[in-house]
């Protein structure tokens, strides 16, 4: 009887081991297949005298593919979920150039984490100029991709460069005046007062010293002042970083306080009617950071805009089901307008 039990246990052991081995082999094959669909190359380019860091994704087996240029939103860095988009687009046959702004991550530039629309737009200009020099991509088929704050940047840039073939703006920042009034002054007057204090403090500190007065980028309601302090802000940002403990995020959770003023008077929507290329604008119906109707208003000002809205919050597009749905919609839009071969 003991021998039979031992035999049964051995058979079960081998069956389970075979099942695990089969699953591991399948996963290995999937990873190998994905890794052979594109390569990622470290790149460095210059903006206003500083070295900016970037990744260039190149699809395998495609000579001079079209290219998508992307950068992150407010206080974001390129490793925060942007590779998820870049990899999917590369698998669809497009090159992707993902860069960090001056002062962020491993890019040079002072002050650190300086969120400034004019400065960011200079970096976009430099990225576009650099990508045009690459002989590994077809810069005549170029798209711009932005999200949140950079969703506004790509609209401004597309209006500036008529040769751009397509633009994608995900949950974009559209109008600083409307955002400040509707989402902050009316909703939380104390936020406006505290923001004014920190903005003035930063200006004074920077005038008389070499330092900056920093504020937190993300926080929770009732905590120390943060530029993004809605109920879903901190958890939303942590989703992008993959960091579970927000204490581990605090070392990069800051930016100079004068953004309170520069953000208020930044209005990408004022340039929307100058965008000539096809545009995909994606809105979030439950957005608490920006007015939910802003993306639709911006799309209505464009000549060739497609507008999509989803019942989601500002930070939801980056993961889970919203990401899976939207990345396919974006990919199909880009493939069509960048004339990607259907053979890929």
Each model region followed by its residue ranges:
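Conserved alpha/beta-hydrolase "acid-adjacent" motif
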Residues: 288-294
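Short beta-strand/loop motif that positions the catalytic acidic residue
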Residues: 275, 281-283
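The serine-hydrolase catalytic nucleophile loop
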Residues: 75-87, 101
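Alpha/beta-hydrolase-fold enzymes
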Residues: 156-243
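Conserved alpha/beta-hydrolase
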Residues: 88-108
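Catalytic nucleophile-loop/oxyanion-hole region of alpha/beta-hydrolase
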Residues: 78, 104-139, 320-321, 326
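N-terminal cap/lid segment of alpha/beta-hydrolase-fold proteins
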Residues: 27-61
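Catalytic active-site module of serine/aspartate enzymes centered on a nucleophile-bearing elbow/loop
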Residues: 310-344
């Amino acid at each position: 009887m003991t021998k039979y039990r031992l035999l049964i246990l051995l058979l079960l052991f081998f069956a389970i081991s075979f099942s695990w081995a089969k699953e591991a082999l399948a996963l290995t094959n999937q990873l190998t297949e994905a890794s052979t669909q594109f390569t990622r190359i470290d790149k460095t380019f210059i903006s206003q005298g500083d070295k900016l860091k970037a990744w260039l994704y190149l699809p395998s087996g495609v000579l001079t593919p079209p290219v998508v240029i992307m950068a992150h939103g407010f206080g974001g860095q390129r490793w925060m979920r942007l590779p998820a988009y870049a990899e999917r687009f590369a698998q669809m046959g497009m090159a992707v150039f993902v860069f960090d702004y001056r002062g962020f991550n491993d890019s040079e530039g002072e002050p650190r984490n300086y969120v400034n629309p004019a400065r960011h737009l200079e970096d976009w200009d430099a990225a576009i100029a650099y990508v045009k020099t690459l002989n590994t991509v077809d810069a005549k088929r170029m798209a711009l991709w932005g999200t949140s704050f950079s969703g506004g940047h790509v609209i401004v840039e597309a209006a500036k460069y008529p040769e751009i073939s397509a633009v994608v703006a995900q949950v974009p920042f559209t109008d600083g005046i409307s955002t400040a009034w509707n989402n902050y002054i009316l909703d939380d007057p104390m936020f406006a007062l505290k923001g004014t204090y920190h903005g003035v403090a930063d200006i004074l500190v920077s005038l008389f010293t070499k330092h900056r007065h920093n504020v937190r980028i993300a926080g929770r309601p009732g905590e120390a002042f943060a530029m993004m302090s809605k109920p879903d802000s901190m958890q939303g940002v942590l989703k992008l970083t993959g960091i579970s403990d927000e204490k581990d995020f605090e070392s990069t959770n800051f930016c100079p306080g004068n953004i309170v003023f520069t953000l208020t008077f930044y209005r990408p929507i004022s340039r929307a009617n100058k965008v000539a290329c096809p545009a995909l604008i994606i809105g979030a119906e439950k957005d608490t950071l920006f007015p939910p109707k802003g993306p639709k208003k911006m799309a209505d000002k464009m000549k060739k805009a497609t507008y999509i809205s989803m019942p989601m919050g500002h930070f939801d597009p980056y993961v889970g089901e919203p990401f899976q749905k939207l990345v396919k919609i974006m990919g199909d839009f880009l493939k069509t307008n960048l004339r990607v071969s259907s053979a890929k």
